[in-house]
Amino acid sequence: MTVDKIIIGAGLYGLYAAQKCGAAGQRVLVLERDPAPFMRATYINQARVHMGYHYPRSYSTAIKSAHYFQRFCRDYDFCLHTSFDQIYATSAHFSWTNAAEFRRFCAAAKIRCDDVAPERYFNNGMCDGAFLTTEYTYDAQVLKNWFLEQLAKLPNVQVLYSHKPDKIEKVGSVWRVTAGDTTMEAPFILNATYAGVNDIHAMLGLPPFKIKYEKCEIILCTVDERLKNTGITVMDG
């Protein structure tokens, strides 16, 4: 099988790229190791639509996040949850960012940062600042279904699930990818695997990115009525 582009990973970035390339008339093949799309970082790690508040030590990243926040909200407003108060707070203990620094950072990045009393949400002495911000979450299942509907309209785009690349090699001017019993070739490969980026780099003979991996747990619980429609993030780094 020969296509114009092989995309590895059927998360948000992979399906976005597939939809854009497919709409431009390119033949696209998406390889996904899981039995369905959006099963990893897109669902587990990225439900927040970032405005940039997470990056007080990188103004450039924060500014880029704010820019793409507006774009994401414009393009995918149908999957957003916006009707809640998003509170950011700075830990009073073991944090590299205190309340004064967070205020300066938000002012420099030109993103909303309205002071609220920390005691409204936290025990006394736990946080030295709390702020009402503008940041949203999205429903990954709604967004996934939208992308699948768009891709279904493009006969030149194919997604193969449960297909983890076993081997990638350069053959002349194209890349040959083997995944199980399937072999495909393309002059262009997009690695959209996120946490699995170094697995693909190893197959390509490229040096690995110096990435620190941390386990992530999603805790589902029923909250007190006073915390309904409130999102809370504590900055302790």
Q: Language-model segments: what does each one mean?
A:
Residues 16, 182-237:
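Flavin-dependent oxidoreductases
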Residues 46-121, 126-129:
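Dinucleotide-binding Rossmann-like beta1-alpha1 core, especially the glycine-rich loop
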Residues 131-188, 192-199:
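Helical element adjacent to the flavin cofactor pocket in flavoenzyme catalytic cores
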Residues 26-28, 113, 189:
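Hydrophobic anchor at the start of a short beta-strand
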Residues 22-44:
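Glycine-rich FAD pyrophosphate-binding loop
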Residues 19, 23, 149, 153, ...:
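Short, well-ordered alpha-helices that flank and scaffold nucleotide-derived cofactor binding pockets
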Residues 3-30:
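N-terminal Rossmann-like FAD-binding beta1-loop-alpha1 element of flavoenzymes
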Residues 3-4, 78, 186-187:
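Local beta-strand N-terminus motif with an aromatic residue
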